Design a protein with these regions (language model features):
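Active-site neighborhoods of metal-dependent hydrolases
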Residues: 2-28, 33-34, 38-40, 44-53, ...
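Acidic, glycine-enriched loop/beta-strand segments at the rims
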Residues: 237-248, 253, 297-302, 310-344
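Short loop/turn motifs at secondary-structure junctions and domain boundaries
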Residues: 203-204, 310, 354-357
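C-terminal cap of metal-dependent C-N hydrolases
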Residues: 251-262, 281, 331-385
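Divalent metal-coordination and catalytic microenvironments
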Residues: 13, 125, 218, 268, ...
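Hydrophobic alpha-helix feature that most strongly marks membrane-spanning transmembrane helices
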Residues: 53, 88, 117, 215, ...
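Short, solvent-exposed cationic patches
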Residues: 386-395
């Protein structure tokens, strides 16, 4: 049945298929069960990938198992050897996320090269800054599941402000954060790491951490968060990075971004619209890594967000300005292009919450030859269409 479904999807223009072996992909608590693909045998997965290889079409994308990031080199090697063997045997391009700063980062980058040398195709997906959760008092906080906090957070904002301003109430709320049990999986905020949680004043440059501001003010980090919320009418955003996916410094990030077999494209925003905002990694690349750090030339930066991903995913009709290619074009000012601070919107069905992030410095966006955005405003033109692929990646 699975084989027939896969072939039908490829015939309909699917780019390939994905699977998750990550223990972090779980159903919401209290269920907390892993997604179904987590239990699939490696033999079953290999059979599907090899079937796709026989068609000469498709890319296989994998959310990898924890063994790939194990602190034990032997465990990492076994996981990498198995994946490389599949890439060579099937002939299918295989792609997965390579977070900078992980114990398995260097091994994964080396595997990209050794796979190519062995005759396989493999490319890694990288990030310009690392996956983070965007938290706020208008949105989601790590403490919201605790009874003491849930009671307060269910109140209107005016009532919440009174409680967050009351010294005795603040003590109770701070105490609750010390004893509560935090979520460990799924798409929910993790336990606070105040040394790795940043107060989002800028969407480009480095921001102070909650821990740094707490030390300056000589108060508990949770009190800093309350104070900043009160000072900003609850609009202040906080970014908490996953310590397993965030680079410790610029050099670690550049090691993944500069590798010739990686694509700057890793994002989880589509799955977690109210918690994660990675759609700005392209403007972040141009603002931070190209303009501010000058780690890449403008031409290199543009190629990283156009031709490189197009070729990796098998789209030979776009990603470059030439006669006959699809006219998907952004016209931007290199001196000002940058992501803006995200905002929280309630425009999903039933008023559900999502994060929205705009950019500045983009003068016009052209989709299939139609100007769809001009100076940040939608023109009414709808040039986009569902992308279909009939060829595998060529990296």
């Amino acid at each position: 049945m699975m084989e027939h479904k896969l072939l039908d999807a490829l015939d309909a223009g699917a780019i390939g298929f994905t699977s998750s072996r990550s223990n972090g992909h779980k159903l919401p608590e209290p269920d907390n069960r892993p997604v179904a693909s987590y239990h699939a045998s490696w033999e079953e997965l290999s059979q599907l990938v090899c079937l796709m290889g026989k068609t000469g079409r498709g890319v296989f994308e994998l959310s990898r198992e924890r063994e790939a990031r194990s602190p034990d080199p032997a465990v990492r090697k076994a996981a990498n050897d198995r994946l490389q063997e599949l890439a060579v045997k099937s002939g299918v391009p295989i792609t997965f996320g390579i977070p900078a700063g992980s114990p398995g980062t260097a091994d994964a980058l080396a595997m990209l090269d050794s796979t190519a040398e062995a005759g396989g195709r493999m490319f890694g997906q990288t990030h310009t800054r690392g996956i983070s959760h965007v938290l706020s008092f208008k949105g989601r906080l790590q403490f919201d599941d605790f009874a003491e906090w849930a009671r307060v957070r269910a109140l209107p904002e005016d009532e919440q402000r009174k409680i967050f301003s009351d010294p005795e109430q603040r003590k109770k709320l701070v105490a609750a954060t010390k004893s509560g049990v935090y979520r460990t999986g799924g798409g929910e905020p993790r336990k606070p790491n105040y040394e790795n949680m940043y107060v989002m004043y800028s969407a480009v440059s480095r921001n102070p951490t909650v821990a740094e501001l707490a030390a300056q003010r000589n108060v508990d980090p949770v009190e800093v968060m309350m104070d900043l919320a009160l000072e900003s009418n609850f609009n202040q955003l906080f970014m908490q990075f996953d310590v397993a996916t965030v680079p410790k410094n610029d050099e670690e990030a550049l090691a993944t971004l500069r590798h010739p077999r990686t694509v700057m494209t890793f994002s989880d925003s589509g799955a977690h619209v109210s918690l994660i905002m990675d759609s700005s990694i392209h403007t972040h690349l141009l603002a931070y890594w190209v303009r501010e750090r000058q780690a890449f030339s403008l031409e290199e930066g543009v190629k990283m967000i156009t031709l490189t991903p197009a070729m990796a995913w098998g789209f030979t009709d776009r990603g470059i300005l030439r006669q006959g290619s699809i006219a998907d074009i952004n016209v931007f000012d290199p001196a000002t292009i940058a992501p803006e601070i995200p905002t929280i919107e309630h425009d999903l069905p039933a008023g559900a919450r999502r994060l929205k992030q705009k950019s500045k410095g983009i003068l016009a966006t052209v989709i299939a030859g139609k100007v769809t955005f001009k100076n940040g405003e939608h023109t009414g033109a709808l040039g986009g269409k569902l992308l279909r692929s009939s060829a595998a990646g060529v990296m």
